[in-house]
Each structure stands twice: as C-alpha cells, then as structure tokens.
C-alpha cells in the first residue's frame, strides 16, 4: 500500500460527472489520478466539495448558501442587530459597499449581502475560490437566495496585490478575517480548519493586508479576530466590538452617511 502524500486529486462522484471533473482538473492544474493524495476535490450532485482522505478524515467541506447554516443564519441570525452589521456600519439608510478581502467560504460576505450590502470578495487559495464559485453559481438558481448572491462578486488572487493595484471606485469598507491559529472546538469549525490549514496556512502577512486595506478603503476597515487574540501589528483600532468568541477591531477613516 502506498503512503499518503500531500497531493490533491479531482474525482467524479459518479460517471455522469466525469466531464465536469475533467474541466475542474484542467482549471485547477490537478490530476484525476493520484492514489497517494491527501485531499480530493469531488464533483457530484451537490456540486463541488473538498474531502480530506484517510481514516481519521472529517466530512467534506462545500459552500452552500441555500440550505443548512447559511439558511438558518439568514432567517434567525438577528438581521441588522448582528455584531458584524454594526461593525461594517450598517444602519438605517446605510448599506456600505464592502470588500471582503479574505473571503474563505463566503459566510460573512453572504450575511452582509443578505442585509443589502454590495459585496466584492477576494479569495487567494484556488481550491477555496473554486468552492466559492461553485456555491455562488448554485445559489443563483434559487428563487430566494439568487438576489442575495447577485450582490456578491468574486475575485481570485492575492488580496494585498489586488488592493494595491485597485482601479475604479474604492470600497467604502474593507473587511478582513485573517486565518489565525486559534483553538475553536466547535465541530464545524474544527472540520473546516482541519481541511483549510494544510491548504491555506495562517495569514502571516496580516500586517501587510491591514496596511493595504487602510490605504484603499474610503470609510473604514474592520478586522475580525478571535476574542482574546492580539490586534494586528500596525495602527491601533479606534475601538472594538466584542462577542463571545470573536471581536471586530474598527479602523475608521470617515463617517458613513445615508
């Protein structure tokens, strides 16, 4: 038996998805065959998902804006009273244009889009960006969620470089949630982190990310951190909003107006 490596393969969950699997393999530059792979990008009835391989592997990770956690948060998440809404400056008559420069699986961006914000998302890791692209495409077909994801535009690549080379109108608010080595024990976060960490690693460039965001945003920068984590090296935030497990550090530049 071959030892498991660190590679990634693409596989179809059934014969009818073989062509889609070939397309994704070509786009991502990944093989369709690799018996030693540590991860599989799987193509099936539920779209695209990433499955860690091996006996102790958690379940697959995919993006689903229509059902599950996203649907529950959309319906019961607290609307404009949510801390993230206050952090980015949502108020009566104010729905800022927001750039989420560390999009991940798009959960926070989806919450803000569901509250009416026009969102631009940047994701640097090609596999995570592929999950996000697939989730957005499936959500567009849903009658209720389609208009929400219609407010979400996905860009791929290095967020620092993209912000430094930004052309056109600057985003009013830039939202950052750098990958941070924290110990959240919830099953879902644990599963996603176990899959993410080997693929993405920690954002050791967080100070440069903050610097680029502060240079570009017209009104404010918001940084989400684990509640007890230190602030990112660089300018100090003016204030923070603190929740049970996380907090939002606010770096204002000028007031948002209705």
Swiss-Prot record:
Presence of keyword S-adenosyl-L-methionine: yes
Catalytic activity from the UniProt record: guanosine(1516) in 16S rRNA + S-adenosyl-L-methionine = N(2)-methylguanosine(1516) in 16S rRNA + S-adenosyl-L-homocysteine + H(+)
Bias (Basic and acidic residues): 239-252
Cellular component terms per the entry's GO annotation: cytoplasm
Region (Disordered) residue spans: 232-258
UniProt keywords, alphabetically: Cytoplasm, Methyltransferase, rRNA processing, S-adenosyl-L-methionine, Transferase
Subcellular location: Cytoplasm
Primary subcellular site in the record, as a coarse category: cytoplasm
EC number: 2.1.1.242
UniProt keyword annotation of Cell cycle present: no
Molecular function as annotated in GO: rRNA (guanine-N2-)-methyltransferase activity
Binding site for S-adenosyl-L-methionine: 123-124, 177
Function: Specifically methylates the guanosine in position 1516 of 16S rRNA.
Listed HAMAP family: 16SrRNA_methyltr_J (MF_01523)
Family: Belongs to the methyltransferase superfamily. RsmJ family.
The protein's name in its UniProt record: Ribosomal RNA small subunit methyltransferase J
Source species: Pseudomonas putida (strain ATCC 700007 / DSM 6899 / JCM 31910 / BCRC 17059 / LMG 24140 / F1)
Gene that encodes the chain: rsmJ
């Amino acid at each position: 038996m071959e030892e498991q490596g660190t590679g990634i393969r693409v596989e179809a969950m059934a014969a009818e998805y073989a062509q889609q699997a070939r397309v994704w393999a070509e786009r991502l530059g990944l093989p369709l065959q690799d018996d030693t792979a540590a991860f599989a990008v799987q193509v099936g009835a539920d779209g695209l998902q990433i499955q860690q391989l091996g006996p102790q592997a958690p379940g697959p990770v995919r993006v689903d804006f229509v059902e599950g956690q996203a649907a529950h948060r959309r319906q019961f998440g607290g609307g404009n009273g949510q801390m993230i809404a206050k952090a980015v400056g949502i108020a009566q008559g104010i729905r800022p244009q927001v750039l989420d420069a560390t999009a991940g699986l798009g959960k926070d961006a989806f919450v803000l889009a569901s509250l009416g914000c026009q969102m631009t998302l940047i994701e640097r890791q090609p596999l995570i960006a592929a999950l996000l692209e697939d989730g957005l495409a499936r959500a567009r077909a849903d009658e209720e969620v389609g208009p929400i994801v219609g407010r979400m535009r996905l860009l791929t690549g290095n967020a620092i470089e993209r912000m430094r080379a930004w052309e056109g109108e600057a985003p009013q608010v830039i939202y950052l949630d750098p990958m941070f080595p924290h110990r959240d024990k919830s099953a879902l976060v644990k599963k996603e982190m176990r899959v993410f960490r080997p693929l993405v690693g920690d954002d050791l460039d967080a100070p440069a990310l903050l610097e680029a965001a502060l240079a570009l945003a017209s009104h404010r920068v918001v940084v989400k951190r684990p509640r007890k984590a230190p602030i990112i090296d660089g300018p100090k935030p003016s204030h923070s909003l603190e929740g049970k497990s996380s907090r939002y550090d606010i770096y204002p530049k000028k007031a948002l107006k209705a």
